[in-house]
Amino acid sequence: TEGPFFYIPMVNTSGVVRSPYEYPQYYLVNPAAYAILGAYMFFLIIIGFPVNFMTLYVTLEHKKLRTPLNYILLNLAVADLFMVIGGFTTTMYSSMHGYFVLGRLGCNMEGFSATLGGMISLWSLAVLAIERWVVVCKPISNFRFGENHAIMGVSLTWFMALACTVPPLVGWSRYIPEGMQCSCGIDYYTRAEGFNNESFVLYMFFCHFLVPLVIIFFCYGRLLCAVKEAAAAQQESETTQRAEREVTRMVIIMVIGFLVCWLPYASVAWFIFTHQGSEFGPLFMTIPAFFAKSSSIYNPMIYICMNKQFRNCMITTLFCGKNPFEGEEEGASSTKTEASSASSVSPA
């Protein structure tokens, strides 16, 4: 059923379909599902905000963590905080009421925040892939990834993300409630007159999904070949090679995590766009949409788990300047420090 600013995946033969901005949508699924949805969003908020804020705070507090590579990783934390503060709180509040109680303004805010966070994350991973390719493969001789390059990379991620998320706010496509009608996203569902949804969805998928993915896969394809060649030729010291491998491994795991979280949502959205008129239930889009939102917690978790230097700094911050585990980490830290001086970036 299509309304002026909404689309509900249900034929209105019974006459019970109501605007998701004005009435509870309990006729779509059991009311308990909305309670579960609200609890899930609360979980993401109480985990996502502290770990991303801690990532931001610890990196800014410890000077040795302020490396060019970490600028991009900080950008990921900022993007996740946008999702948590601007999107998750709105969705949780809507789930508690069973409909989008904040109206179209809240829908635009939630859809914009969630999409912006996802786009910044994807383009940040593309920039990280380029950085890894340039540092490891050395297509440009004597090139060092410095602070100016990192700032340019961060600026690029925001420019591209805003180029994708602002148009629906000004009339090229739109944000509408989706799934159980408690979260909002791009209108993949309708051919509403005056919004040009078809052209925007094609633009979004090709320019803001396929292009960064092609960049990522190209860079890591070349990188894997270069790593094998360097290992065979022993062109660099073992310490340098180990440092670069650890950084690369962390970034690749971040890419895999992004794909695991967002690829189901993108696939379902593309299916709905290319099969408009097909029958599907409210959970068909709700499950992948809320699975994608979990991406806000995996990046800092990966960073904390795989970066010993950051982990030591975080423990020092949490224990008011002291690290009770310093003796256990001393050997690993000294190795990491040595690798940092040998590598052109700070190893993770």
From Swiss-Prot:
Regions of this protein lying in the Cytoplasmic compartment: 59-70, 131-149, 222-249, 306-348
Family matches, as PROSITE patterns: G_PROTEIN_RECEP_F1_1 (PS00237), G_PROTEIN_RECEP_F1_2 (PS50262), OPSIN (PS00238)
General function of this protein: Photoreceptor required for image-forming vision at low light intensity. While most salt water fish species use retinal as chromophore, most freshwater fish use 3-dehydroretinal, or a mixture of retinal and 3-dehydroretinal. Light-induced isomerization of 11-cis to all-trans retinal triggers a conformational change that activates signaling via G-proteins. Subsequent receptor phosphorylation mediates displacement of the bound G-protein alpha subunit by arrestin and terminates signaling.
Membrane topology value: Multi-pass membrane protein
Residues exposed to the Extracellular side: 1-33, 94-107, 171-199, 272-283
SUPFAM superfamilies documented for this protein: Family A G protein-coupled receptor-like
Source organism superkingdom: Eukaryota
Record motif 'Ionic lock' involved in activated form stabilization, residues: 131-133
Chain ranges passing through the membrane: 34-58, 71-93, 108-130, 150-170, 200-221, 250-271, 284-305
Gene Ontology cellular-component annotations: membrane; photoreceptor disc membrane; plasma membrane
Major localization class: membrane
Single Gene Ontology BP annotation: visual perception
N6-(retinylidene)lysine PTM sites in chain numbering: K293
Site (Plays an important role in the conformation switch to the active conformation): E110
Residues covalently joined to lipid (S-palmitoyl cysteine): C320
Glycosylated residues (UniProt): N12, N197
Pfam families: 7tm_1, Rhodopsin_N
Subcellular location: Membrane; Cell projection, Cilium, Photoreceptor outer segment
The record's account of how the chain is modified after translation: Phosphorylated on some or all of the serine and threonine residues present in the C-terminal region.
Name the record gives this protein: Rhodopsin
Family, per entry: Belongs to the G-protein coupled receptor 1 family. Opsin subfamily.
Paired cysteines (S-S): C107-C184
